[in-house]
Design a protein with these regions (language model features):
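Sec-dependent signal peptide recognition
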Residues: 1-4
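Glycine/tyrosine- and acidic-biased, solvent-exposed loop/turn segments at the edges of beta-strands
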Residues: 7-124
């Protein structure tokens, strides 16, 4: 059973919600307003590893979405505008080198994806 705990916040009527796995580890913590995710949210796997951080506005992804490798290094960063990819989306190798970059407008890729190999050399 997932245990939910609501904590009241003093900022702009937001509440903070936390959810836990059966083993007691935190599943997520998120700011909510009017029953919608609103603000920053962080998600962990069952072993306690941070897997992503997401920014929400009125229940929609709005801002950055960051995914992490189990090692803690950044796997990807994408920008969203009301649930649609908008701006740069970058993937990284676990060593921190860029893997790919794609630019989006209104959830549509508008430029060719640039790709790199693990050494940082552009692939053609």
């Amino acid at each position: 059973m997932i245990l939910l705990i609501l904590l009241l916040s003093c900022s702009a009527g937001n509440k903070f919600e936390k959810s836990y796995y059966d083993n007691g580890n935190l599943r997520y913590k998120a700011s909510k307003k009017n029953n919608y995710f609103n603000g920053d949210a962080e998600y962990w796997d069952e072993e306690g590893n941070l897997i992503n951080e997401v920014e929400y506005l009125n229940g929609m992804i709005h801002g950055q979405w960051v995914d992490y490798y189990l090692s803690g290094s950044i796997k990807s960063i994408a920008n969203y505008n009301f649930d649609k990819k908008d701006g740069l989306e970058t993937y990284y190798y676990e060593n921190g080198n860029k893997k790919s970059e794609t630019f989006y407008e209104n959830n549509i890729p508008v430029k060719n994806t640039i790709r790199w190999n693990i050494k940082g050399e552009i692939l053609k």
